[in-house]
């Protein structure tokens, strides 16, 4: 039997137009968007499930371009949890984070690296319907230099040949994207005020990008300091993650490359007020946060494409914070509609999935989010989720109060 769904009378933010459209019906059939228009133009077929969208806004499902679902968010360095937590607990934690993300409106998530097979197992379990969560683009272990950021749970390499071999191994194991660690992690590693230093060489980064492209994969690069941002951008990565300490000159190189910036603003935003940080962590936060703000504001002013990525797995940063990330992008200078596109059409283009998701258009995969009110007047309304549709199926619904 053909599965049909019509969401009636909504305000539509389609991820393309500069303005929302009022009083629109969107019909879904067999997992795809079949029709969009006024009610008189789109009569629903017999047997259609109807959702009344009056007073609500329909958007494309949200996209998280930087997630770590298996990591413990309750400790300063969640990577340490992999040293002592049993695999069963890690897997259950990942499943819980995935469900939390889905219920907040996230329908696609790009992993930014996890140890072993956790990414692949979670992705496959969601695809099989064993657990609920967003569609996951799995990265597997991040590519890093020996002793570099994330080394205990990454794939270490020390030459162009080693990095090429690592990309091939990750793809063999099931990776759909490749994570390259181009710099230190200023918030986590031992550091001074020169934190965020470059780790992978530009030749190594270029080798990763070239081999990934040969295998039809894209590369995201953890790059916090300016030199790492420049190296990653020149190497041809699809996106630069964080850029906490990047200057305008560094960002000029990023802009020229055409790569997207995924600033992960929730990290320093959450840490501004979180309790229980160690004195060292508080010192890192106090130093990095204003520089991070300046970097993102500069990137927005320069017109660099910005996409949402929570970096969930960092202490206090949870998988339901994509809507928060949209709001933070707006607060750093982007118009509200542009910030929403950062979680929809810009994010989809960053992942290379713009033909499938990221906009509400006929023929696209029916990943949809219905929220109360008008988020363009208050982006906090993105957190007032009413219905989440993934692949044409209603996967989460909140009854009206």
What feature does the model see in each segment?
Residues 2-5, 12-59, 80-81:
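Histidine-rich, glycine-flanked metal-binding segment
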Residues 343, 349, 362-401:
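C-terminal cap of metal-dependent C-N hydrolases
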Residues 93-119, 132-144, 175-189, 218, ...:
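Divalent metal-dependent hydrolysis catalytic cores, especially in the metallo-beta-lactamase
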Residues 214, 289-371:
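His/Asp/Glu-enriched, well-ordered alpha-helical/loop segment
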Residues 56-130, 149, 203, 235:
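Metal-associated gating/positioning segment near the N- to mid-region
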Residues 68-90, 99, 132, 140, ...:
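Active-site gating loops and adjacent loop-to-helix segments of metal-dependent hydrolytic enzymes
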Residues 155-235, 239:
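Metal-dependent enolase-superfamily TIM-barrel catalytic cores that perform enediolate-based chemistry
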Residues 73-76, 119, 188-190, 229-235, ...:
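Histidine/acidic-residue-rich catalytic or RNA/ligand-binding cores of hydrolases
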